[in-house]
Regions:
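Pre-active-site segment of Zn-dependent metallo-hydrolases
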Residues: 23-67, 98-102
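Active-site metal-binding motif and surrounding structural segment of the metallo-beta-lactamase
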Residues: 52-92, 181
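Short glycine-/acidic-enriched loop or helix-start segments at secondary-structure transitions
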Residues: 55-57, 78-80, 101-102, 152-153, ...
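Short, compositionally biased "basic patch" segments
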Residues: 1-35
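Alpha-helix capping/helix-boundary segments
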Residues: 75, 96-97, 190
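Helix-adjacent hinge/juxtasegments
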Residues: 80-121
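Residue-level marker for the onset of beta-strands and adjacent loop->beta junctions
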Residues: 7-8, 33, 107, 128-130
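Metallo-beta-lactamase
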Residues: 2, 19-20, 25-26, 42-45, ...
Length: 214
C-alpha cells in the first residue's frame, strides 16, 4: 500500500516524551495517526505517516531520530522514505507479509526494541500484528489496529476488515493485564484518562452488539 497523499504539517506533544501527528488518509477514507517516543534526546518513530519538510525539521529539533518501529505490514506508510531521509533502521515483525522493502531488523514478541518499546503479539486485525508497550513512568501502549477511535470513545474496526474479530477482542482483553496510563491507536487521538476503562466499554459495547438479533 502506497503512502497517503496528504502530509502532516505539524505534530503535537501528548507529553514531552510522546509526540503525535495525523492525516486524513485517502487510502482508507479514515483518519490515521502516528506516534514517536522521545528518550535521552533520541526519537523512535512508530508507524510513521508523511510529514512535511518543516515538520520534519521541527521533529529533528526535538531530538535525533534513531529508529522506525512498525506494528505490522499494513502500517508501512512512510517508513521506507523516512528510513532514507534519516539514515535509520526499520524494525518490523517476523513473518510480516507484503512489505514493500526489506526491514533492517525482524522482531518477535518480548524482545527489546529501541526507545524501551517491547512488542506484544496482538493478532486479530491480521495474524502478524503487534502492539508496542512502553513500561516507563505511567506506561504507554501503542495498540495499532486492535482498537480505534469511534465517535467519543474506543471501538473496533468493522469485522469485514479484520482477519479474525474474535481474536482482536481477545487481544484487547489481554491489554488489560499490562501497565499503561496512555493508550495510542493507529486511528485516533491518545486516550489519557483511564484508558483501561475505555477498553472495557468498547468490549462491553461489542458484546451487546453481538447479542443483538439480526
Amino acid at each position: 500500500m502506497t503512502e497517503p497523499s496528504s502530509q502532516a504539517t505539524e505534530f503535537d506533544a501528548v507529553r514531552p516524551d510522546l509526540l503525535h501527528w495525523w492525516v486524513e488518509d485517502d487510502r482508507i477514507h479514515h483518519r490515521s495517526d502516528s506516534w514517536a517516543v522521545v528518550h535521552d534526546g533520541r526519537i523512535v518513530l512508530i508507524d510513521p505517516l508523511p510529514l512535511a519538510e518543516p515538520a520534519i525539521e521541527a521533529l529533528e529539533a526535538q531530538g535525533q531520530p534513531v529508529a522506525i518501529c512498525l506494528t505490522g505490514s499494513c502500517h508501512q506508510r512512510s517508513a521506507w522514505r523516512l528510513r532514507k531521509r534519516f539514515g535509520i533502521k526499520v524494525y518490523a515483525p517476523q513473518n510480516a507479509e507484503g512489505l514493500e522493502e526489506t526491514p533492517d531488523v525482524d522482531y518477535a514478541e518480548g524482545v527489546a526494541l529501541p526507545g524501551g518499546l517491547v512488542p506484544v503479539h496482538a493478532p486479530g486485525p491480521t495474524e502478524v500484528h503487534y502492539a508496542l508497550h512502553l513500561d516507563r513512568d505511567e506506561g504507554t501502549l501503542f495498540c495499532a489496529d486492535v482498537l480505534i477511535q469511534r465517535g467519543e470513545g474506543l471501538g473496533f474496526v468493522e469485522g469485514k476488515h479484520q482477519d479474525d474479530p474474535a481474536r482482536t477482542r481477545e487481544s484487547a482483553r489481554r491489554f488489560l493485564d499490562l501497565k499503561f496510563g496512555v493508550l495510542c491507536s493507529a486511528h485516533g487521538s491518545a486516550v489519557t484518562h483511564r484508558p483501561k476503562d475505555a477498553i472495557r466499554r468498547a468490549l462491553e459495547h461489542e458484546a451487546k452488539e453481538g447479542r443483538r438479533p439480526q
